[in-house]
Swiss-Prot record:
Gene name for this UniProt entry: gcvPA
Keyword DNA damage: no
Record's protein name: Probable glycine dehydrogenase (decarboxylating) subunit 1
Superkingdom, taxonomy of origin: Bacteria
GO MF, one example: glycine dehydrogenase (decarboxylating) activity
Family: Belongs to the GcvP family. N-terminal subunit subfamily.
Enzymatic reactions: N(6)-[(R)-lipoyl]-L-lysyl-[glycine-cleavage complex H protein] + glycine + H(+) = N(6)-[(R)-S(8)-aminomethyldihydrolipoyl]-L-lysyl-[glycine-cleavage complex H protein] + CO2
Length: 444
């Protein structure tokens, strides 16, 4: 269908219908200096062939992980994605990012989501998982909102170092609305200071949040943190990396009330930041408080198994003010990628991926620590990524190593921090890591 722009008469008619004199009256909150005063300088009209050629040239300026040896982490990881995954998720029956509204005629999609929920429950050790949320940060914000609704309290305590972007989303969701405050606890050697956390606990704390492994890759004392949360009636929220659960204890095993996570490592490509996958699971007693969509199994009138959307306490179905959340969709395609990834890898395969990440990260960390001018910032145990003190500013290291064919890591200076956050996945070979160390050693 062709696009036909509105004419001046069309615009005047619409403005008159809503009782407005000009378009500018509709956007008074936008400062005038940010409004266009003249037409945009756009490309001249092009044919389809010319547009394709232009886009190819623009795209060629990008530098992506297949072109470099990547050690970037910080929430998005260069894991191997099995070839069969793309073939399966590209089937036309599955290829949608949305949960079907006509659930009765979309049994295949609903079953895939049901299997995803079941696998997430097993992986995280929880009783109920939803059909996914937008990403890990959104899942964390929804977990905090749920905790406040459950407890009636208004303060959230961050026990360790969570991703700064997640922290920003929390502030937008929670603090911007004037509903609550988010308090960051003190860190010692990169992890939560348990004594400081205990001193901050009170009966006004709605939830205690911990990321495991934390943003720095360090492993937190989740048992002690969870015990403190429970002793004050606060909900215990754990943001756990799904790949790490191939080796680490599941959040449900150490008493998490809500478990969330970023599902990107489970078969989703890096994709310049998205779309990703928000994992969200809860203990059984909170099943009616969980946000997002839930797929359940039932029997049809013929006694056959069937799948439905159930417990739909969202704003589409009930009054907005009574909804558990205004999140009313999910990342169906990414959830499908996750369930296909987990199915292809199997329990043993996921454990092997986690083991490779752990061993290779420690191999590289030991090699880098031996270089003059370099040192590990933290002494405690870590999984897959670690922070390195560098002899020059981390941004210099990143730019120099890029010229050598490496994505050297995540410059923590972006977040007013220091050091280089380096991640190692199962894809990295010994030869790549040795070459990386050799090139790092030339920077001083």
């Amino acid at each position: 269908m062709p696009f036909i722009a509105n004419t001046d008469d069309d615009r005047r008619s619409m403005l008159q219908a809503i009782g407005v004199g000009s378009f500018e009256e509709l956007i008074p909150d936008i400062p005038s200096e940010f409004c266009l005063k003249e037409a945009l300088s756009l490309f001249p009209s092009m044919s389809e062939m010319e547009v394709a050629s232009l886009l190819d040239r623009l795209a060629s300026a990008n530098r992506t992980s297949p072109d470099y040896v990547s050690f970037i982490g910080g929430g998005a990881y260069d894991h191997y994605i099995p070839a069969a995954l793309k073939t399966i998720v590209s089937r036309s029956e599955f290829y949608t990012a949305y949960t079907p509204y006509q659930a009765e005629v979309s049994q295949g999609t609903l079953q895939a989501i049901y299997e995803y929920q079941s696998m997430i429950c097993r992986l995280y050790g929880m009783s109920v998982a939803n059909a996914s949320l937008y990403d890990g940060a959104t899942a964390m914000a929804e977990a905090v909102s749920m905790a406040m609704n459950v407890t009636g309290r208004s303060t959230v305590l961050v026990a360790g170092k969570i991703h700064p972007n997640t922290s920003a989303v929390l502030k937008t969701f929670i603090e911007a609305g004037g509903k609550a405050s988010v308090v960051q606890n003190v860190l010692t050697d990169g992890v939560c200071d348990i004594a400081a956390l205990e001193s901050r606990m009170s009966d006004q704390i709605a939830a205690v949040i911990v990321q495991q492994p934390n943003f720095y890759g360090c492993l937190e004392d989740v048992e002690a943190i969870g015990a403190l949360a429970r002793s004050h009636g606060a909900l215990f929220i754990v943001s756990a990396d799904p790949v790490s659960l191939g080796l680490l204890n599941a959040p449900g095993r150490y008493g998490a009330d809500i478990a969330v996570g970023e599902g990107q490592p489970l078969g989703s490509a890096l994709n310049f930041g998205g779309p990703y996958l928000g994992i969200f699971a809860v203990a059984e007693k909170y099943v009616r408080k969980i946000p997002g969509r839930l797929v359940g199994m039932t029997k049809d009138r013929d006694g056959e198994d069937g799948f439905i959307l159930t417990l739909q306490t969202r704003e589409q179905h009930i009054r907005r003010e009574k909804a558990t959340s205004n999140i009313c969709t999910n990342q169906a395609l990414n959830a499908l990628q996750a369930v296909v990834y987990l199915s292809l890898m199997g329990k043993d395969g996921l454990c092997q991926v986690a083991e490779h990440c752990l061993q290779k990260a420690h191999y590289l960390a030991d090699k880098i620590a031996d270089l003059p001018g370099y040192s590990l910032r933290f002494a405690g145990p870590f999984f897959r990524e670690f922070v390195v003190n560098t002899p020059v500013d981390a941004s210099v290291v990143v730019n120099t190593m890029m010229e050598k064919g490496f994505f050297a890591g995540y410059d923590l200076g972006i977040h007013d921090d220091s050091g280089l956050l380096i991640a190692v996945t199962e894809k990295r070979s010994r030869a790549e890591m040795d070459s990386f160390v050799e090139n790092l050693g030339a920077i001083s």
